[in-house]
Design a protein with these regions (language model features):
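Tandem CBS (Cystathionine beta-synthase) repeat/Bateman regulatory domains
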Residues: 1-147
Length: 147
């Protein structure tokens, strides 16, 4: 299974829209956006719609711990993660799980030919891996029943 499979399932179930925010928006607006969409990260798009960064709940918590309530007035661009780990649609789910676990991050933008095409979370990856294991288990049970 690859990332493309996860993106296709997300598109079927959720519409597949990518939630983004401008780097000039303040952290309070970003927190409201995350809450409204019930998501844990938002991508930041710069000039030409290119990926500039990602802002996660962890980034917001870090800013709040460093600056207190004043952090809510900081711009997203000041707080976002700039060196974003990305993947392609053809990468395997196993590879993505390894990278996310090793890097200790939960969201990964999917980039194809320099264009942002989606965002996957560790929850998406785990859900699809569980479905894959359940399918394999059911196939094995069917095989045993007919043997």
């Amino acid at each position: 299974m690859n990332v493309k499979t996860i993106l296709a399932a997300k598109k079927r179930n959720l519409g597949g829209d990518i939630v983004s925010i401008e780097p000039t928006a303040d952290l309070a607006a970003a927190a409201k956006l995350l809450s409204a969409h019930r998501i844990g990260a938002v991508v930041i798009l710069g000039a030409g719609g290119h990926l500039s960064g990602i802002l996660s709940e962890r980034d917001i918590v870090r800013a709040l711990s460093e600056h207190g309530a004043a952090a809510l007035n900081l711009s997203v661009g000041q707080v976002m993660t700039r060196n974003v780990a990305t993947c392609t649609a053809d990468e395997s789910v196993a590879s993505i799980m390894e990278r996310m676990t090793a890097g200790k991050f939960r969201h990964m933008p999917v980039v194809v030919d320099g264009t942002l095409t989606g965002l996957i979370s560790i929850g998406d990856v785990v859900k699809h891996r569980v479905e894959e294991i359940e399918s394999e288990s059911e196939a094995m049970r069917d095989y045993i029943r007919t043997a």
